[in-house]
C-alpha cells in the first residue's frame, strides 16, 4: 500500500456518480426488463475508463472504479456498497414483503420520528429492497460472483493502466455488515457470520491477487449500535462487534495486510446521528482488524472532533489512518484550508507518513455529482496545503510543532 513521507496522499471511500447511460440499464435490470448484455458491458467499460480519468485529472492519488460494477437503480442509492453481494452469493431467496430490517428500530429514528417520516417519503432509496421483499438466507451460502468480479477487475485494471495514479483499490462488503440480513438457515449468529466470511473470502483474495488494494466496507461495526434495542452497555456491544471482527480476520487469513484497508462510518444517510457510538468506545475493536490501513469518518460535525482520540490511542506501527476530511453529509463544499486543518490535526498526532487524506463515505448517490467533484478537488488542494506544513508528531502532545517549511 502506497504511503509517503514527502506529501499527503489522497483517496476516497468508493462510490462515485454513475453516468445516466449506466443508470438506464441498471433500472431495467432491477425492473426485470430485457436489456442487451453487450450494450451493458460496453457502457460499463467506458464508464470505468471515464471515472478513472476524472479522478486522475483532479489529482486523487489512490483511485477506484467508482463502484460502477455494483448496480444502483438511480442516481441516489445508499445501499449498493453491500446489496451488490446478493448477486454474488447463493443460498437466499426474496422474503416476505415488509420493511428492510436495517431501517427498523434505530434509536435515532425514534427520537426524530417526524424528520424521518419526511426523509423516507422523499429521499431514502436502497437497492437492497428487492421490490419490497427483503432477501433472506434459506440455504448454504456460496460464492457465485466469479464472472461479475472478473469483469470489475478487468475493467478497472485496463482503465488504471491509462491514467497517472499512485494506486488502485476495489471495495467489498465485510461479513459483519452483510450479516445484518435475515438468516433462516444457520443455527447461530456465529455460524452465519463465518459462512458469509468464507464465501466472501473468494472475492477478497481475487482482488488482492489482482495486485489491487482491497477495501473492506464495514459501517456496521459502529453503526449497528444504533439498531440495538434496548441500548446495550458498551462492553456488551464490543463483545458483539468482536465476533464480527474475528469472522472477518478468518476471511483474511493468509492475505497480506499491507494490501488491505478497512472502512467504517456511521451510516451515510443525511440524519441527525445523535445516537452514533463514539469512536473512543470502539477504536480498540477497530484496531484488531488485521489490515494495513483504517479508513474512518472524521470530516463532519458529528465526528470531526474525534481526531483527539488518537492522542490517547496508539496507531500500531506500520499502519496508516485514512481519515475523512471532506463529507458526504453536507452540500457545503469544504474550503481547502479547512481540509488542510483537518489533515494536520491527524498528522501532528500520528506523523504525516501515517496519514492519507480521504472522504467520510462514498460520495456517489449521496450528493449531487457536481458537488462530488468539487469536494474531491477541495480534498486534493487541502492535501497540497497540508503538505507545505512541516509536521513533527509528538505522541501524547496536544500541541505538536509545525512550521511553514515543506518537508523534504
Task: Show where each model-derived region lies.
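Domain-level signal for soluble alpha/beta catalytic cores
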Residues: 1-408
Amino acid at each position: 500500500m502506497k504511503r509517503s513521507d514527502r506529501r499527503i496522499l489522497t483517496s476516497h471511500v468508493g462510490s462515485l456518480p454513475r453516468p445516466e447511460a449506466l443508470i438506464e440499464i441498471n433500472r431495467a435490470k432491477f425492473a426485470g426488463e430485457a436489456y442487451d448484455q453487450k450494450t451493458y458491458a460496453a457502457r460499463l467499460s467506458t464508464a470505468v475508463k471515464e471515472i478513472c480519468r476524472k479522478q486522475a485529472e483532479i489529482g486523487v492519488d489512490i483511485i477506484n472504479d467508482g463502484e460502477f460494477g455494483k448496480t444502483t437503480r438511480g442516481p441516489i442509492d445508499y445501499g449498493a456498497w453491500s446489496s451488490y453481494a446478493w448477486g454474488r452469493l447463493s443460498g437466499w431467496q426474496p422474503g416476505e414483503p415488509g420493511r428492510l430490517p436495517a431501517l427498523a428500530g434505530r434509536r435515532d429514528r425514534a427520537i426524530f420520528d417526524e424528520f424521518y417520516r419526511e426523509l423516507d417519503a422523499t429521499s431514502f432509496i436502497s437497492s437492497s429492497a428487492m421490490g419490497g421483499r427483503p432477501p433472506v438466507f434459506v440455504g448454504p451460502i456460496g460464492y457465485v460472483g466469479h464472472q461479475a468480479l472478473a469483469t470489475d477487475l478487468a475493467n478497472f485494471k485496463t482503465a488504471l493502466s491509462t491514467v497517472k495514479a499512485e494506486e488502485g483499490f476495489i471495495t467489498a462488503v465485510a461479513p459483519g455488515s452483510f450479516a445484518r440480513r435475515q438468516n433462516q438457515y444457520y443455527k447461530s449468529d456465529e455460524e452465519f457470520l463465518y459462512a458469509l466470511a468464507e464465501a466472501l473470502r473468494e472475492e477478497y483474495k481475487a482482488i488482492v491477487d489482482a495486485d489491487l488494494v482491497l477495501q473492506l466496507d464495514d459501517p456496521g461495526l459502529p453503526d449497528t449500535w444504533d439498531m440495538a434495542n434496548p441500548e446495550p452497555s458498551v462492553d456488551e456491544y464490543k463483545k458483539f462487534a468482536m465476533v464480527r471482527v474475528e469472522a472477518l480476520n478468518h476471511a483474511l487469513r493468509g492475505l497480506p495486510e499491507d494490501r488491505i484497508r478497512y472502512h467504517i462510518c456511521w451510516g451515510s444517510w443525511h440524519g441527525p446521528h445523535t445516537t452514533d457510538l463514539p469512536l473512543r468506545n470502539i477504536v480498540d475493536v477497530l484496531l484488531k482488524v488485521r489490515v494495513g490501513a483504517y479508513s474512518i469518518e472524521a470530516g463532519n460535525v458529528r465526528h470531526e472532533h474525534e481526531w483527539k482520540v488518537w492522542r490517547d490511542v496508539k496507531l500500531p506501527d506500520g499502519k496508516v489512518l485514512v481519515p475523512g476530511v471532506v463529507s458526504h453529509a453536507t452540500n457545503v463544499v469544504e474550503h481547502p484550508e479547512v481540509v488542510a486543518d483537518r489533515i494536520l490535526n491527524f498528522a501532528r498526532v500520528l506523523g504525516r507518513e501515517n496519514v492519507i487524506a480521504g472522504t467520510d463515505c462514498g460520495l456517489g448517490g449521496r450528493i449531487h455529482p457536481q458537488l462530488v467533484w468539487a469536494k474531491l478537488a477541495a480534498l486534493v488542494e487541502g492535501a497540497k496545503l497540508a503538505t507545505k506544513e512541516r509536521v513533527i508528531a509528538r505522541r501524547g502532545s496536544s500541541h505538536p510543532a509545525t512550521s511553514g517549511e515543506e518537508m523534504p
